[in-house]
Amino acid sequence: MAFQKAVKRTVLVCGGALATVLGLSQCSHYRRKQVNLACLKAAGCHTEPVNREPPSREAQLLTLQNTSEFDILVIGGGATGSGCALDAVTRGLKTALVERDDFSSGTSSRSTKLIHGGVRYLQKAIMKLDVEQYRMVKEALHERANLLEIAPHLSAPLPIMLPIYKWWQLPYYWVGIKLYDLVAGSNCLKSSYVLSKSRALEHFPMLQKDKLVGAIVYYDGQHNDARMNLAIALTAARYGAATANYREVVSLLKKTDPETGKERVSGARCKDVLTGLEFDVRAKCVINATGPFTDSVRKMDDNKAPAICQPSAGVHIVMPGYYSPESMGLLDPATSDGRVIFFLPWENMTIAGTTDSPTKNTHHPIPSEEDINFILNEVRNYLSCDVEVRRGDVLAAWSGIRPLVIDPKSADTQSISRNHVVDVSESGLITIAGGKWTTYRSMAEDTVDTAIKVHNLKAGPCRTVGLFLQGGKDWSPTLYIRLVQDYGLESEVAQHLATTYGDKAFEVAKMAKVTGKRWPIVGVRLVSEFPYIEAEVKYGIKEYACTAVDMISRRTRLAFLNIQAAEEALPRIVELMGRELDWSEIRKQAELETATKFLYYEMGSKSRSEQLTDRTEISLRPSDIERYTKRFHKFDADEKGFITIVDVQRVLENINVKIDENTLHEILSEVDLNKNGQVELNEFLQLMSAIQKGRVSGSRLAILMKTAEENLDRRVPIPVDRSCGGL
């Protein structure tokens, strides 16, 4: 009976798909022609940027304060806000952008890192005959192709595998994926294909083998989201937009329209978050592009304005790279609760996510342990039982807030729109909300079109289709080779610089410090296991980085890849930034504390540390307890029952290992559960038990004590009969 239902369902879907194919095929040629014409038109009207390099931050602030009136003021420095600024300034409009935090500090840096058309939206469009969903997918696929073209250094096509565990699913999903290719038309990245079970396991050897039928592989795009956002903002700055981070809007300015007698929004009162200085920025039009905080700006305009944003939290986790193949992702289309989970390689690590749950609006979202465990359980369902998915392998975790919106002009005020909404208030405030990363450019185009119409601005047509972003124009896949040959950088570092900065990588390489080694000649790393170098800190300041958090999370992506590595790099990053920005010792200490707090709460360190508590059960075999107790007493020579930093220093001196005192304090603090400045035997056994269970991994104290024990054992005096002595 179930089989018959499945067959009927498949036949129904295939029939509907065939009808859709016939309908779409009629306009396929026309659509392709229109896209090509649009690209040619855009290419023909592109002008060169006003500035070869983005102006300094100080110059941007002076422009903001001294300009009598802008045509457009954009509030919000995420992908959409930066996109609006770029769209407006390239049309010839005098443009300003202000952001209360850093560019991409909110939702735009906490995505799944995909540039996708929304394959699941296409499924809904077909099953429910939803034209809006279809148009959204069609638009997103066009924007996907454009984004891959204008920022080739920051983005690339990624094959994604859809494992099939039931025979009837094969034709069902195959038809859907092929339709995805068809809707993309000339913008299709690569054609999807079917894999047999053996070929699927060859590509993804850690996949669950039992009942596996085969797999379907389709292509979407992947990018470095925070760097992409920054590239958009920097490109806008090069074209003449006055862009400034750490400028918070505290109120909207209004003036009376002489023609209508009504009050109109005419700018904003801004506050310098770093200094407290307040000043006015006047503009003919103000655009609200604040994502999840859309309603807070709307209420500045009208405190009776109804809320249109319904925030939803999406949690992601990062695991070691060996959890996924280097060049193929995985999609679980139907999790235990009906959600979709992606499992993707990114920056030599593995991203898994996402969740979708209602949340309260906050500037500092915290990933919950419940969501982290949900993702881990879904990962376990798809990976072979030979692969132990451990809680301790979660190297970073974050929560991003999706700004789901209700169209205030829709008859159904309870219906959430998955598309974007452009709203104009009675006083002329223009709000852009909703949408997704992939469609930021078309959202910006719609918003600026509306601004021009509502405020009678004189501007040219949209010019952002095919407009290269910062670093993209002269990039090539072999650019990194020149970095190796011309500057003496490591190949891994050179590849990282090329794919992060594009054709601007040479400027970073010029700043690189000599290593003092035979090879590499230049490029001192911030941490040994990642290709980030010290020169990037200096260059990051040119990219408007103001704080240590900016540097570890958005100029580099250390915080999103490994929170422990980010914490280790922090002192050096603060030292380098302090030297460039002339920070006092008090400011340096404050930056360290703020960045450490950011890692603890927002990047998953809190959840990770809670895996080891004073209530953690010790479940070790007697032989293990004996072995670990012996190891502990290598440090606790006086058998006090606890060890302090002095005990650790004494042992390290015996094996000629030098670690600075601050680092040692940090290492012991990770395990010191009752925070009394010493690690007791019971705490050490709790740590080793948690490591065995997989709840904790990478404990620096555990690694240090094991290494010390091995070195001490090697230094046991050699017996006389092994030293060629005696009879």
From Swiss-Prot:
Q: Where is the transit peptide?
A: 1-42
How does its record describe regulation of its activity? Calcium-binding enhance the activity of the enzyme.
- Keyword Protein biosynthesis included in the entry's annotation: no
GO BP terms: namely: glycerol catabolic process; glycerol-3-phosphate metabolic process; NADH metabolic process
Q: Name one GO molecular function term.
A: calcium ion binding
Question: Keywords for this entry?
Answer: Calcium, FAD, Flavoprotein, Metal-binding, Mitochondrion, Oxidoreductase, Phosphoprotein, Repeat, Transit peptide
A GO-annotated cellular component: mitochondrion
Function of the molecule? Calcium-responsive mitochondrial glycerol-3-phosphate dehydrogenase which seems to be a key component of the pancreatic beta-cell glucose-sensing device.
Q: Which family does it belong to?
A: Belongs to the FAD-dependent glycerol-3-phosphate dehydrogenase family.
Name of the featured protein: Glycerol-3-phosphate dehydrogenase, mitochondrial
Q: What is the lineage of its organism?
A: Eukaryota, Metazoa, Chordata, Craniata, Vertebrata
